[in-house]
């Protein structure tokens, strides 16, 4: 079952920029950068993608490698615990290869410093030996492209961030774009889906393709059990309501956060640490997963004194301000 799921996940990923839906400005610019690099016969400039989880950072890196006709090596910041881990990867890269580092903001400082000469000069500085007898050896690397992905660009050090030639932000997707993504995924998965069914799932997907595809799978389960010929708006609405996903895509935790903020703290302001304790949730989870969409919807405000619920949040929760 796990292997089947992984195959489905891989098959629904766009392979080219033409297949990729949304992020129009980013795609247009990336197309230019790719074409220019191919024309010069050089590796692409190092690229940093940042934005909320599930918006397509990994997919874009895979598309870059495919369009350039090079291999892609994947790793993540937390995995690179020692400088030797990164050095081993860098020395094995072929000419023009793409190294993708997810959660690059979580790389240890010692590992990060190994990247500086590698990114600028395609050289690796290694220290051989210890104490007075230690010496530095320079190793030439093949030209490569580093693609970093992060949900928290503010946690990247300036020296690392400034070494990226291309820095692009991924935005939340519109409901119309998500409906197109849902229709594309449904076609690949062999799910019969009506136009209004796609729209219903798209508008409840929190502006995020990963969530849209996940909701489609769960709605498909309901359609299968109910022996429905197609996923309609009515079926999708009923299934998502049973999953505690409301008409704007807010789930149980979103509503709990707003409810606690309004009922326990009179709408705020309240510090995020206090709010996290009251919601029995991690601070980072609130900041990375829940807050961005609530702010995007206009339900939550960040102020110097803490988080505040907006009048729109009171109305959505059917509570009096």
From Swiss-Prot:
One of its GO terms (biological process) is DNA recombination. DNA binds at residues 302, 307. Pfam families: AAA_lid_4, RuvB_C, RuvB_N. Keywords: ATP-binding, Cytoplasm, DNA damage, DNA recombination, DNA repair, DNA-binding, Hydrolase, Nucleotide-binding. Signal peptide: none annotated. Residues 1-173 are annotated as: Large ATPase domain (RuvB-L). ATP binds at residues 12-13, 54, 57-59, 120-122, 163, 173, 210. It catalyses: ATP + H2O = ADP + phosphate + H(+). Its EC number is 3.6.4.-. SMART domains: AAA. Its main location: cytoplasm. One of its GO terms (cellular component) is cytoplasm. One of its GO terms (molecular function) is four-way junction DNA binding. CDD domains: AAA (cd00009). It is found in: Cytoplasm. Belongs to the RuvB family. The RuvA-RuvB-RuvC complex processes Holliday junction (HJ) DNA during genetic recombination and DNA repair, while the RuvA-RuvB complex plays an important role in the rescue of blocked DNA replication forks via replication fork reversal (RFR). RuvA specifically binds to HJ cruciform DNA, conferring on it an open structure. The RuvB hexamer acts as an ATP-dependent pump, pulling dsDNA into and through the RuvAB complex. RuvB forms 2 homohexamers on either side of HJ DNA bound by 1 or 2 RuvA tetramers; 4 subunits per hexamer contact DNA at a time. Has 3 domains, the large (RuvB-L) and small ATPase (RuvB-S) domains and the C-terminal head (RuvB-H) domain. The head domain binds DNA, while the ATPase domains jointly bind ATP, ADP or are empty depending on the state of the subunit in the translocation cycle. During a single DNA translocation step the structure of each domain remains the same, but their relative positions change. PANTHER family: HOLLIDAY JUNCTION BRANCH MIGRATION COMPLEX SUBUNIT RUVB, PTHR42848. Homohexamer. Forms an RuvA(8)-RuvB(12)-Holliday junction (HJ) complex. HJ DNA is sandwiched between 2 RuvA tetramers; dsDNA enters through RuvA and exits via RuvB. An RuvB hexamer assembles on each DNA strand where it exits the tetramer. Each RuvB hexamer is contacted by two RuvA subunits (via domain III) on 2 adjacent RuvB subunits; this complex drives branch migration. In the full resolvosome a probable DNA-RuvA(4)-RuvB(12)-RuvC(2) complex forms which resolves the HJ. This is Holliday junction branch migration complex subunit RuvB. It comes from Oleidesulfovibrio alaskensis (strain ATCC BAA-1058 / DSM 17464 / G20). The gene is ruvB.
């Amino acid at each position: 079952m796990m292997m089947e799921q992984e195959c489905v996940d891989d098959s629904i990923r766009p392979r080219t920029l033409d297949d990729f839906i949304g992020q129009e400005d980013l795609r247009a610019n990336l197309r230019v950068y790719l074409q220019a690099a191919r024309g010069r016969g050089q590796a692409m400039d190092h690229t940093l993608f940042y934005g909320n989880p599930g918006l397509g950072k990994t997919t874009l890196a895979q598309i870059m490698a495919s369009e350039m006709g090079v291999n892609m090596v994947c790793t993540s910041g937390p995995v690179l615990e020692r400088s030797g881990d990164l050095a081993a990867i860098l020395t094995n890269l072929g000419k023009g290869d793409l190294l993708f580092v997810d959660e690059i903001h979580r790389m240890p400082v010692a590992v990060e410093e190994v990247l500086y000469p590698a990114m600028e000069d395609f050289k690796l500085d290694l220290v051989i030996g210890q104490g007075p007898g230690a010496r530095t050896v320079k190793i030439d690397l093949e030209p490569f492209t580093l693609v970093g992905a992060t949900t928290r660009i503010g946690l990247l050090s300036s020296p690392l961030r400034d070494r990226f030639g291309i820095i692009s932000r991924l935005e939340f997707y519109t409901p119309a774009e998500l409906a197109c993504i849902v229709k594309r995924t449904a076609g690949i998965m062999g799910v019969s889906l009506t136009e209004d069914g796609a729209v219903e799932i798209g508008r409840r997907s929190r502006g995020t393709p990963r969530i849209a595809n996940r909701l489609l799978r769960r709605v498909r389960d309901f359609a299968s059990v109910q022996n429905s010929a197609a996923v309609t708006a009515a079926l999708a609405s009923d299934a998502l309501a049973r999953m505690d996903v409301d008409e704007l895509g807010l789930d149980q935790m979103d509503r709990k956060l707003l409810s606690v903020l309004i009922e326990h703290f009179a709408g705020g302001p309240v510090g995020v640490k206090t709010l996290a304790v009251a919601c029995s949730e991690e601070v980072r989870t609130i900041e990375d997963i829940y807050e961005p969409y609530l702010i995007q919807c206009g339900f939550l405000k960040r102020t110097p004194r803490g988080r505040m619920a907006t009048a729109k949040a009171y109305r959505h929760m059917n509570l009096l301000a």
